[in-house]
Every structure is written in C-alpha cells, then in structure tokens.
From Swiss-Prot:
It holds the Pfam family Ribosomal_S8. One of the primary rRNA binding proteins, it binds directly to 16S rRNA central domain where it helps coordinate assembly of the platform of the 30S subunit. This is Small ribosomal subunit protein uS8. The gene is rpsH. It comes from Pasteurella multocida (strain Pm70). Keywords: Ribonucleoprotein, Ribosomal protein, RNA-binding, rRNA-binding. GO terms for molecular function: rRNA binding; structural constituent of ribosome. PROSITE patterns: RIBOSOMAL_S8. The lineage of its organism: Bacteria, Pseudomonadati, Pseudomonadota, Gammaproteobacteria, Pasteurellales.
Amino acid sequence: MSMQDPIADMLTRIRNGQAANKVAISMPSSKLKVAIANVLAEEGYIESVKVLDGVKPELEITLKYFQGKPVVESIQRVSRPGLRIYKRKDELPKVMGGLGVAVVSTSKGVMTDRAARQAGLGGEIICYVA
C-alpha cells in the first residue's frame, strides 16, 4: 500500500528523530521534500540536507540541537491531501507572532511566509515550524 501523505510522514520523521536525539534521519526523496528541507535549513531549523542517489533516492537530513535541546519546538502539517489550505499574500499567517515560519508552496517555488509576502505571492500553506 502506498503512503497517503508523504509530507506529513517527513515532518513526523523530523519530530520523532529530534525526540529520540538522533543525529540524522533518512526517508524516500522527492522534489517537494527536498525543497521543504532546504527552506528549513535556510531558516536554521535543521543542520544540512543531502540527497543520496541510488535506485530509490534517499533524503538525509542532519538535525540541529542547541544546548542539548532540539531547535524545532513544534512542526505541524497544515494543508493535507483531504483538505488543502490556500492563502492570498495578505492572508498569509504569522506563526508565533513572527517567531516561527510557515512553509508556503507558491508558483515561484517553496518558500517561507516572509519571502512570499515580500514577493507578493500567496499559495498553499504546507506546514508551520517554530
């Protein structure tokens, strides 16, 4: 049986990996997962992103900790296969009053809510990270 929501699976692997104090986690790779991971790395929530080529490409994410505690306090899926959530540029949410980020899939690629607001773009809210 195939996976119903691979993005939710990715976010859960990150959450579980940090709860278990893992150094790195791996999962099946896709373009969207790599784009989301790159946004999280740019924002400083994860250490690094690597795509391991093979018959089935694997995405390896190195997790980040600060003073022994996970940098990601919460990571929450918003738009899901059964209920897609789209917002216009002026409706984009501020996560934790601007302390967290919303990862948004726009027509110009995957970016943070801040970058989407600056570019004047709306899109699908993939997840909230704080």
